Amino acid sequence: MGAIKASCPGSCGELFQCVVDGEEFLMSYGIEKKSQVVIGPQTGVMEEGLRPKMLQVINELTDQIDFDYTFQTDISVGKGYSSSTADMLSILGACSAYKHGTVSVPLLTSLCSKIEPSDSVGFSDWTVMNPLNGAIQWQTRWKPKLYVYILEPDQMVDTTSFIRMTDSPLYPAEQSKTLLTDFKIACDKQNVELLGSVATRSALLNNKRLPKPYLNDIIDLVNKLGLLGVNIAHSGSIVGILLTEEQLMHMTELEERLSHHPLASYYSLRNLSKIIYDGLQVKKVEEILE
């Protein structure tokens, strides 16, 4: 069989995360950063070795790595970009297609969750899932045209080391239940304003468990400029400012205000990304070259 290429986007944290009846749920959206794996009998010089979690998860699918591979990524680690999930899904997707000829995103996501709590970046539709087992709670086909201005600090964190929402006495789990309900309403009504509100509320609730520096200042600025909302990496360090396409006209003023605020030295890396709906993409290399 010829070579197979698989890629999976990272995310800027989660649009929202909540606890319902003692069970954790989250929804991640894709951004223009990705992990990519090519496997086959001959793929050329290996550019980068597989990361430890990729090697761990591949053992859930096969007991023999009898193929060559290349691995590339532009997703930062230890920030909340879903880098591990994107890495694992890329190698799983490529291996599954190469060895078995089929790819099941729900199955592969559940395999990732055996290694560590995972995100829903593998799905091309927005998907609410349990990060601990990959079980799907709800999906929507709505694909609003949105952007995110990502605020990234220099420091890295171990995103798996934080206490879970369900175990944290600081997290207001009961209040968070409405996030899931309101997210469903926002999607059914295609209401981007309610969507932004869900994201911001989720960020504020999580701030009681894992405070983000300057979060309230960022939200105040977003409200002053009339932007959509703020979302965060609930177990990471990055923050996202959500914008509609029409609100991109405020980007110059937004960056100017951010750059003159003390938060600029903390969130020193700032970049704009389109929110994408690619999910896990798997193709034969010949199809890519045609």
What are these regions (language model features)?
Residues 1-79, 278, 290:
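ATP-binding N-lobe of GHMP and related small-molecule kinases
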Residues 233-240:
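Small/polar glycine-rich anion-binding or flexible loop at a beta-alpha turn
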Residues 6-8, 19, 29-31, 119-122, ...:
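Solvent-exposed alpha-helices and their adjacent loops that cap or buttress functional pockets
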Residues 79-105, 121:
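DPxDG-like acidic metal-binding loop motif
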Residues 5, 15, 36, 128, ...:
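Conserved hydrophobic/aromatic beta-strand scaffold that supports enzyme active sites
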Residues 36-38, 227-233:
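Short, flexible, solvent-exposed loop/turn segments with mixed acidic/basic and small polar residues
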Residues 103-228, 244-290:
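ATP-dependent small-molecule kinase catalytic core of the GHMP/sugar-kinase superfamily
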